[in-house]
Curated annotation (Swiss-Prot):
Gene Ontology, cellular component aspect: plasma membrane
Lineage summary: Bacteria, Pseudomonadati, Campylobacterota, Epsilonproteobacteria, Campylobacterales
Summary of subunit composition and partner proteins: The complex is composed of two ATP-binding proteins (MetN), two transmembrane proteins (MetI) and a solute-binding protein (MetQ).
Residues that bind ATP: 36-43
Subcellular location: Cell inner membrane
PROSITE patterns in alphabetical order: ABC_TRANSPORTER_1, ABC_TRANSPORTER_2, METN
Name of this chain's protein: Methionine import ATP-binding protein MetN
Length: 327
């Protein structure tokens, strides 16, 4: 495991219980989206991973090493393998792009003759090789975040922490940053933890996700599995799953989930012909995830109890997820 958080509790001096019994694992190469509402404990959690915050109790293991047991110099060295980017970029305004990236290498005591080539390599990676002499005030928000990404990768980390890294960006720039991170992850075989309150970020970038609420992880798993079958009320709210049946009563109203391979199949029309049952489509949509697409239909079966039961058995036999909606 790249990251293991074990039985984490975080209680601040004012008595606020920010994290409660948190257990979390991250495997090599995974991109984990941690999502939740403001004040849920997301930023506290990510700052524990590199010990910018220390837990009240529990263990923080990165690559098998408990960071809480390290001496200050040992912790500083371990942090060099953990990159981090923030919502507001944290660039040095008095230094240009080249100098901002080089600064991370200077702190790590790289040899001067190696710093120049490494900075050029990093700026090429993030598409800013033509901006190396620009200062932060001359850059757009997206360009500033690219500089921050380059700086975070300076010491060849195997783990990248992103704390609301796209929250200050517009949707087009957010997409370009997520595309960049996805490409970098594949090229460098990084593991990424991405804190966000934006479900679109999870959809576009992540293969794993966890939902945090009031300091607790309430749901954790593959992105497509949670999108297909969310269990916790907070997860359903974040995914926008609420009152899909409108003002209609829920008698014989069902939510059907279509995973990847079934999206292009005429399943509903086949069901109507095969079982001589009428189907009223109340709502539907398709979620495009980074791993696979998922389709949803909310339908009402208009037929006898026997016909409805046969239709449900048919859908279950196809491996579709079918949930009867409640009032």
């Amino acid at each position: 495991m790249v990251v293991e958080l074990k039985n984490i509790e975080k209680i601040y001096e004012n008595g606020f219980h920010a994290l409660k019994g948190v257990n979390l694992e991250l495997k090599k190469g995974d991109i984990l989206g941690v999502i939740g509402y403001s004040g849920a404990g997301k930023s506290t959690l990510i700052r524990l991973i590199n010990c910018l915050e220390r837990p009240s109790s529990g263990e923080v293991l990165v690559n098998g090493v408990n960071l809480l047991n390290l001496k200050p110099k040992e912790l500083q060295k371990a942090r060099q393998k953990i990159g981090m980017i923030f919502q507001h970029f944290n660039l040095l305004s008095a230094k240009n792009v080249f100098e901002n990236v080089a600064f991370a290498l200077e702190i790590a005591r790289w040899e001067k003759n190696k710093i120049k080539s490494r900075v050029h390599e990093l700026l090429e990676l993030v598409g800013l090789e033509d901006k190396m002499h620009f200062y932060p005030k001359q850059l757009s928000g997206g360009q500033k975040q690219r500089v921050a990404i380059a700086r975070s990768l300076a010491n060849c980390p195997d783990l990248l922490l992103c704390d609301e890294a796209t929250s200050a960006l517009d949707s087009k720039t957010t997409h370009s940053i997520l595309t960049l991170l996805s490409g970098i992850q594949k090229k460098l075989d990084l593991s990424i933890v991405f804190i966000t309150h934006e479900i679109e970020v999870v959809k576009e970038l992540c293969n794993q996700m966890c939902v945090i609420s009031s300091g607790e992880i309430v749901e954790r798993g593959l992105v497509e599995e949670i999108f297909a079958n969310p269990k916790h009320a907070v997860t359903k709210e974040l995914l926008g799953i609420k009152n899909e049946h409108g003002d209609q009563k829920c008698q014989d109203v069902y939510r059907i989930v279509f995973l990847g391979e079934h999206l292009d199949e005429p399943i509903i029309s086949n069901l109507i012909r095969r079982f001589k049952i009428d189907v009223s489509i109340i709502s539907g949509n398709i979620e495009e995830l980074t791993t696979k697409d998922i389709g949803y239909l909310v339908v009402r079966f208009l037929g006898s109890t026997t016909e409805t039961q046969r239709a449900l058995e048919y859908l279950n036999a196809l491996g579709l997820q079918v949930e009867k909606l409640k009032d």
